[in-house]
Structures are given as C-alpha cells and as structure tokens.
C-alpha cells in the first residue's frame, strides 16, 4: 500500500497537494501544526478539508514553542502584517524562522511511524516569496539529512515547486477541486477564508494567479501539464 503524509495548513497550496495525493496514493495522512499563528482559524479549516477530501487521519501537532522562538508578524499580534508591495526586497516580516525545518522534520517522523514513503509539501520557488525555506535546495538538503538521521528512505515531494500560482489553480481544477479551493481554503495572513483580505501578499499572489488562470485557462492548463507530466 502506498502511503503519504501531507503537511497541511488548509490553504490553497496544501489543499491542492492533498487533492492530488488522494489520486496518487492509497492512503493519505495530514499533519497540521499549531504554532500560535495569527491566522489560527486555518487549523479548523484544515480539519474540515482533511475530512472532506478523505484523509485517512489528520493530526494537529502542538509546536507553540516555535512561537516563543520565532518573531514574525504571523506569530506576534504587535507586528502588523504588511500590505502587498510588488517590488519589496529581502525577507518579509511574515517569514517564520525555522518553520519548514520543524514542520518537515516532524512530518517525516510521523511518516516513519505510519510507514509512509513520502512527505508532501506545497512550497514553491517559482512565485518566490522571499522565504529561504521554500527553496528546492533547502528541501533536498533537509530530506537528505532526515533520511540519514532515521536510516529510512522517506521522499520529500514538492509538486508545486516549479509551477506558478496560476498553474496551481489549474492543478486544482485538473483534480476537480477549483471551487473548493477557491471558496473553502484559508491562505490569507489575516485569517480570512476564501478570497481573504485582499491586501496582504498571500491574498495578492492568490488573486493574481486566479485571474490569470480564468483569463487564459487553456494555455495555463497546458503549461501546467507540461511542467508536471500530467495528461
């Protein structure tokens, strides 16, 4: 039996990954992390979506220690979430240091226990947000270290790594989940479901991608299929 673990936030990217995993694996587990994030509503959204999309199990892990160590606008109400700035340089204040290091490592430990062959994460380098822990180089390096540390061959899969946000919408549509992803996921840094606040970087990237996909469906779908190998 083929098993996978999805690092699952209930946002657009991880929900699209879950939708795909349900078609590619016999058994899919979801792991969601409570780190005291500003947008904690995502945990309830993740619970609902994991059930709706047929995950075998859904674990919510308490990692609130990360909140104490990592200062970010996503972990501190006193730090405002910035509006989208198209030409902003450097690492944004929404970056949570160590988040993906911790999430992927814990997901791999869980995968070890349930005998899953893959950990799936929705990180993406194409629409690079300034987060160093979303890079392909980082994921591969951590995957190598985790496998050495557990003497186990667990594969970190990044199905969105080389597709842009419009193509991610196309992927959701390919698996028949465009409306669900559009209406029921929570991507917004300010914790607003669906289309979100419309001002933060996450909402801007999501909306621009959706508009581009809806305006150029055939071309974007074809590009997504070419990059992912889907038919």
From Swiss-Prot:
Any one Gene Ontology molecular-function term assigned to this protein's record: ligase activity, forming carbon-nitrogen bonds
Catalytic activity: 7-carboxy-7-deazaguanine + NH4(+) + ATP = 7-cyano-7-deazaguanine + ADP + phosphate + H2O + H(+)
Binding site for ATP: 8-18
Keywords noted in UniProt: ATP-binding, Ligase, Metal-binding, Nucleotide-binding, Queuosine biosynthesis, Zinc
Example of a GO biological process term: queuosine biosynthetic process
Cofactors named for this entry: Zn(2+)
Binding site for Zn(2+): 188, 197, 200, 203
Pathway given in the UniProt record: Purine metabolism; 7-cyano-7-deazaguanine biosynthesis
CDD domains for this protein: QueC-like
The record's free-text note on cofactor binding: Binds 1 zinc ion per subunit.
Domain of life the protein comes from: Bacteria
Main EC class the enzyme belongs to: ligase
Stretches that traverse the bilayer: none
E.C. designation(s): 6.3.4.20
PANTHER family: 7-CYANO-7-DEAZAGUANINE SYNTHASE
HAMAP family (alphabetical): QueC (MF_01633)
Family: Belongs to the QueC family.
Record protein name field: 7-cyano-7-deazaguanine synthase
Biological source species: Salmonella paratyphi C (strain RKS4594)
